[in-house]
């Protein structure tokens, strides 16, 4: 079974599929080892790793090459966050085959204007395109894919933009009609009430995708019980964990005036070498170096 088929089968199964954010291949490998079903190729995390805002500042080629590197490192499906599709429907028609060829099994595209502003800012620009325009972008994406099992996910930002439940449902239905395989509904409310209301009222046939960053109260068991949700994405926990751990270790080294105390608490160099695939390289050396 290919990665694309695995993701499609998971969506069709009715069981909850979990995806963890990653901003480089090493983090993706750790996510796979932890048992997540897939990788979320997060634009927010990649932007943060370059220390720039999540506002389409990084080029498509920068994001695409990282997705290619991640996909080549893990054996689980990669869901690529392509923001607004890097332009209009013409751009989307070009972009989708690039991500498919890079090894992604799905793309998530949101209905904001280009360039976007991050949904996580309370005072950000949350400007949405017309429904008809985004339907065209979805149609372009589905037409451009070579493999029918490649998944196109439409991300509805109406709740983020403060447009209410009715508009969010209207957009979700329109995007399903345009050919989206799933609908990602996003909210930054600190309780799950807004999302739960949307899920309850969702009349569509395609599964929903949730990103519970703002409402961590919902467990996977809670989400699975909703029955309409096919994927849960942990959208930025890798970069947040990395920043917290690095900051703590650096501060401790400065405080201690050296690494003697902190070293025992860190993964060993041997562990890092193992994560680099050293054993595989040594096997190649033994077989082919003459």
Curated annotation (Swiss-Prot):
Positions with a binding annotation for Mg(2+): 81
GO molecular function ontology, one term from the record: metal ion binding
- InterPro entries to which the protein is assigned, alphabetical: ICL/PEPM (IPR039556), PPH (IPR012649), Pyrv/PenolPyrv_kinase-like_dom (IPR015813), Pyrv_kinase-like_dom_sf (IPR040442)
Comment on bound cofactor: Divalent metal cations. Co(2+), Mg(2+) or Mn(2+) can be used.
Q: How is its activity regulated?
A: Partially inhibited by EDTA. Activity is restored by Co(2+), and to a lesser extent by Ni(2+) and Mg(2+). Unaffected by Cs(2+) and Ca(2+). Activity is reduced by Mn(2+) and Cu(2+).
Q: How does activity depend on pH?
A: Optimum pH is 7.0. Active from pH 6.0 to 9.0.
Q: What is its EC number?
A: 3.11.1.3
User: Which reaction does this chain catalyze?
Assistant: 3-phosphonopyruvate + H2O = pyruvate + phosphate + H(+)
Residues that hold substrate according to the record: 40-44, 155, 186, 188
Coiled-coil boundaries: none
Family annotation (Pfam families): PEP_mutase
Q: Which UniProt keywords apply?
A: Cobalt, Hydrolase, Magnesium, Metal-binding
The UniProt record describes its induction as:
By phosphonoalanine or phosphonopyruvate.
Q: Which residues form the active site?
A: 54 (nucleophile)
Cofactor(s) this protein cannot do without: Co(2+); Mg(2+); Mn(2+)
User: What does this gene product do?
Assistant: Hydrolyzes phosphonopyruvate. Not active towards phosphoenolpyruvate, glycerophosphate, phospho-L-serine or phosphoglycolic acid.
**So what family is this one in?**
Belongs to the isocitrate lyase/PEP mutase superfamily. PEP mutase family.
Its subunit composition reads: Homodimer. Homotetramer.
* Protein name stated in the entry: Phosphonopyruvate hydrolase
Q: Which organism is it from?
A: Variovorax sp. (strain Pal2)
Its organism's taxonomic lineage begins at: Bacteria, Pseudomonadati, Pseudomonadota, Betaproteobacteria, Burkholderiales
